[in-house]
Structures are given as structure tokens and as C-alpha cells.
A protein has these predicted regions:
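Active-site mouth of glycoside hydrolases
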Residues: 3-21, 25-270, 274-279, 285-289
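Alpha-helical scaffolding within the catalytic cores
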Residues: 5-10, 38-45, 287-306, 335-343, ...
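Substrate-binding cleft of secreted/luminal carbohydrate-active enzymes
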Residues: 22, 310-318, 324, 330-405
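Acidic-and-aromatic substrate-binding clefts and catalytic sites of carbohydrate-active enzymes
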Residues: 30-38, 64-65, 72-73, 189, ...
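Acidic (Asp/Glu)-rich catalytic clusters
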Residues: 44-51, 172-173, 299-312, 343-350, ...
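Aromatic- and acid-rich polysaccharide-binding/catalytic face
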Residues: 227-249, 299-331
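Extended, alpha-helix-rich binding/interface surfaces that flank or overlap catalytic cores
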Residues: 367-451, 496
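C-terminal beta-sandwich/jelly-roll accessory domains of carbohydrate-active enzymes
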Residues: 422-506
């Protein structure tokens, strides 16, 4: 597979073509399954047919290091087999060290030996993630991790984590399709997360309820009451109000990113880069930025203060009703705000964005249109993404139909815009041409003929249709020999109209 590099806010392959990565999460959090999704090579072939070209592939710390300093290479071998299947189907992979609620005791992630909760109680809520805000055990265990408290062998928990990452990266070092390392899924601050929540509650009380001196415990109880939570969400539906709420918590959330997360990333990155010098460092935000709090994330630097190469911003984005069936109050304006905030961070960092998680949808019929709307955001920003997540029933889900779309996988030149219309099946792409092939995935390639393709901006071009074996989908390759031309490619129903519009514009 062609090697990828980071060039400013773009991914480029070794030919210099601009690459859009479009894929899915494959993460098994079930210890009974050995933390490996049961599947075979056929699933990866299907991923390719669906237009996916990247997988966020989950690792679990408990799977990699079940005892202090003892690594389970049999587990890593099973994961590696999936990486090989991905390569055989032209799928890039980045490894995600996944955790939810920090530990196998409460969710998934850290092994029991790395879970130091000081015997505090674990409390759960209506939604799994409520435990971040309610469980003393989860927060104490996270506090010990961020403090690098010694494990039973006298080695710090973070030091174990970095060494574990080094071992995993070295084990996978001969896999050419592994592009990077997502160092921790959704880092949560621990006890200081209560301060973030408290700041938001105080802002809500003041701006929505008109209470200047709120009873914080009483107000927090509104969020943890399933029925009253819906009333709180209604108060957060107005975007000016929601901006005030997320902005109120920005500084306290960013303190964690600057003072705790940044040195953790530096330590972990150094371990990974010692065995994978060019692997992408995939940087996530604090957990709270999933909801639109602006991240203060900084790029990783070496001990001399030099910014390391090949870093990628991999934020997540979910509306507040995620993991529920309340699609009637799903707020697309909040989603736009979340990703607009991530875009602001990208412009500050000047690195590519690959949205590591979004969606988490059920089979509700509304998820088709919701997915289309979110994908339109990614198209506008020219972002890469991996949908959360592969699961039983995925192929029949409404949202899966929205994920199966035409898009430019590799553009020979500088991509400026593209858009796919599910209603008409048409795709438009604007770019400034360079040497090489532009490779366009289309889910209905078998129905496309050369007369369905228009290339405006040059009279000299070549088109080749490359269907996938036994599939309706495939790749449409376009070669434009002229360099520096403003090119518009249209595939689908409005070819003649697009040419006329382009000529009038010129």
C-alpha cells in the first residue's frame, strides 16, 4: 500500500495525491471474546466494497498486558491477523488503545492490577457514561493513573502504559498499512471532571433558570434523573445558550489538557516513536470536548521543544442524546457547533482531522438523514472519519446506507470541494490538477458509463472504470495530464447542467 504522510492539513500518499480516509471503528470490548471481534477476511472485503479505506482498530490494555510487564502476544497476533486482512483489501489501519470508564472493573481498558480505586464504591447511572460523573471508584482510579502512581511492582501506571504501547507498536511494526496510533480513547480527567460539570451547571442555572446562587448538588441531580434530563436538554437547545454553557467550561477543561494530557502524550509518543519513527500520532481531546467545549490540545514536542512530525487531530463528536433513543430531540445545531469548534482547533494546530468517532446510532429510521447531515459537514471541511462502530446488524441499519457514498479517495492535485447527493446519486469534485490519477470510489459503479462523467477545465483527460470483483461498487480513475488547471468532475444525473454552469462561471 502507498505510504501516507501529513502535509499541513492534508494527508498525501507517496504519489503526492491528497487522500480522504473514510472508514469505521472495529473495536471489541468484550473480555469473553478475548477483545477480538469475531470475523474473517470476508468482512474486510465487504468494508472495501462499501468504500471504506481505513479502520480504527481497537486494542485493550487488559488484553495487551494482563499482568504487570507481561504481554500477551497471542492476543496481539489475533489483532495482527485483522491488520493483514485489512491490507489485503487496501485498508489502512490506525490502532486505538480503547477505554471506557478506565478499567475492566467498570467498563473496558486498564487491567485489574492497574485499577487503584482505594476501595471506593462504583456508581452507575441511566447511561454508561454517567459513571464518569457519579462513580467515586472510576474517578479515583483515573486520578491514580494521571498521577503515575506506582503499581505493585514499583513502576508507575503511566510508565507501564507507555511501555505497553511500545511493545504493541513494535509487534505490529512490519504491517505497512498501519498508519498511526490513537494513544488513548476519550481521556477523562478524573476527579477534576467534577469541576467541569460544576461550571456548566452554574452557567445553566444562571442563564436558563435565572438562579444566581444555585444549589449545585440539587441541580446536578436533574441531569441524573432520566425524565428531568430531558427538560435540561430542552434548555440547551438554543444555540446562544449552549455556546455560553460550553464556553464557561473551556478553561477548566483545557487545564487538564495542558497540564496532564500533554505530558502523558509526550511520554507515550516517545515510546511509540522509538519503534515506529514515522507513525502518525493521533491526538484526542479531553472527553468533554466531545460535546463542543473547545480543546486546548497542543502538538507533541520532543525534549528540545521541537514539534514532532506526522501528528493528526482525531476528535470525537456526539450530540447530548447519544446512547439513547431520544432522536426526537436530537439537535443538529449542537452537532454543527461541536464540529465547527473542532475546525477552529484544527486551524490553530494546522494538522489533518480524522474524526475518530461519531454516530453511535441505533437502527432508528432517523439515523439515515442524521448521518447524511453529519457526512455533509465532513465533506465541507474535507475531513477524514471513522464511524462508531461496526456491530451486529450494521449492514441492515439505516445509517449504513448513508455511509455508503461516492467520494474522492485520492485526488491528483489540491482538493478544494466535493459533495455527494444521495437523492440523485451525483458526485461533484473540484480540484487543482497535478500529475497522477484521481481515484473516486462509487457505490454504483456498475451503473456508471463514461457518458455519466463530465470533466470540466480540460479537454485532455482519461477515464477508467475499475469495478471490484463480484460487486456493484468500484473505483473510477481520472487522469488529467495538464497541471495547475481548475478541474470540476461530475458523476451522475446532472452532467450537462454542471458543464453549462462551469462554462458560465469561467
Amino acid at each position: 500500500m502507498k505510504k501516507l504522510v501529513v502535509d499541513g492539513q492534508r494527508f498525501l500518499n507517496e504519489d503526492g495525491a491528497q487522500v480522504i480516509l473514510n472508514g469505521i471503528n472495529l473495536v471489541c470490548k468484550d473480555k469473553a471474546k478475548g477483545y477480538v471481534e469475531p470475523c474473517d477476511a470476508a468482512l474486510f472485503a465487504w468494508f472495501r466494497e462499501q468504500g471504506f479505506n481505513v479502520i480504527r482498530l481497537g486494542l485493550i490494555w487488559d488484553g495487551v498486558e494482563p499482568e504487570p510487564g507481561v504481554y500477551d502476544d497471542a492476543y496481539l497476533s489475533r489483532i495482527k491477523q485483522q491488520v493483514v486482512w485489512a491490507e489485503q483489501n487496501d485498508l489502512y489501519v490506525f490502532l486505538d488503545m480503547h477505554q471506557d470508564l478506565y478499567s475492566v472493573h467498570y467498563g473496558d481498558g486498564a487491567p485489574a492490577w492497574a485499577t487503584l480505586s482505594d476501595d471506593l464504591p462504583h456508581v452507575t447511572g441511566h447511561i454508561w457514561s454517567d459513571a464518569y460523573l457519579e462513580s467515586p471508584a472510576v474517578n479515583r482510579a483515573l486520578d491514580h493513573f494521571w498521577r503515575n502512581t506506582f503499581a505493585s511492582d514499583g513502576i508507575g501506571l503511566q510508565d507501564h502504559y507507555a511501555a505497553m504501547w511500545k511493545h504493541a507498536a513494535q509487534f505490529m511494526a512490519d504491517c505497512p498499512n498501519i498508519i498511526g496510533y490513537d494513544m488513548m480513547n476519550e481521556p477523562y480527567p478524573g476527579t477534576s471532571g467534577q469541576e467541569v460539570l460544576g461550571t456548566i451547571i452554574a452557567a445553566y442555572a444562571g442563564h436558563v433558570m435565572g438562579i444566581a446562587d444555585p444549589n449545585m448538588e440539587q441541580l446536578a441531580g436533574l441531569w441524573f434523573d432520566e425524565e428531568k434530563r430531558l427538560e435540561v436538554l430542552a434548555g440547551m437547545a438554543e444555540m446562544d445558550t449552549y455556546r455560553i454553557l460550553v464556553d464557561s467550561a473551556r478553561e477548566v477543561s483545557q487545564i487538564f489538557e495542558r497540564e496532564v494530557l500533554a505530558p502523558f502524550f509526550s511520554k507515550t509518543a516517545a515510546a511509540i516513536r522509538s519503534v515506529s519513527p514515522d507513525g502518525f500520532l493521533m491526538l484526542e481531546t479531553s472527553y468533554f470536548s466531545n460535546m463542543g467545549i473547545e480543546s486546548g490540545l497542543q502538538l507533541v514536542q520532543d525534549p528540545a521543544g521541537q514539534t514532532l512530525h506526522h501528528q493528526v487531530f482525531v476528535p470525537h463528536g456526539y450530540d447530548l442524546v447519544v446512547d439513547t433513543e431520544h432522536y426526537d430531540i436530537y439537535n443538529q445545531d449542537r452537532v454543527h457547533l461541536i464540529f465547527a469548534t473542532h475546525r477552529k482547533v484544527q486551524e490553530r494546530l494546522n494538522v489533518p482531522v480524522l474524526v475518530g468517532e461519531w454516530g453511535a446510532f441505533s437502527n432508528h429510521p432517523a439515523t439515515f438523514q442524521l448521518s447524511r447531515q453529519i457526512i455533509a459537514i465532513f465533506e465541507r471541511y474535507l475531513w477524514s472519519n471513522t464511524y462508531w462502530c461496526w456491530c451486529d446488524g450494521f449492514k441492515e441499519a439505516p445509517y449504513a446506507k448513508a455511509l455508503n457514498r461516492a467520494y474522492p479517495q485520492a485526488t491528483a492535485g489540491v482538493l478544494s470541494a466535493y459533495r455527494y447527493d444521495h437523492d440523485t446519486g451525483s458526485l461533484s469534485i473540484d480540484f487543482v490538477s497535478s500529475v497522477g490519477e484521481t481515484l473516486i470510489y462509487h457505490p454504483h459503479l456498475e451503473s456508471i458509463s463514461r457518458s455519466d462523467v463530465a470533466v470540466a477545465g480540460t479537454d485532455a483527460y482519461q477515464i477508467e472504470l475499475r469495478p471490484f470483483p463480484d460487486s456493484k461498487s468500484g473505483i473510477l480513475a481520472i487522469t488529467v495530464p495538464d497541471q495547475g488547471n481548475k478541474i470540476t468532475v461530475t458523476i451522475g444525473s446532472d452532467v450537462k447542467g454542471t458543464i453549462a454552469t462551469w462554462q458560465a462561471y469561467q
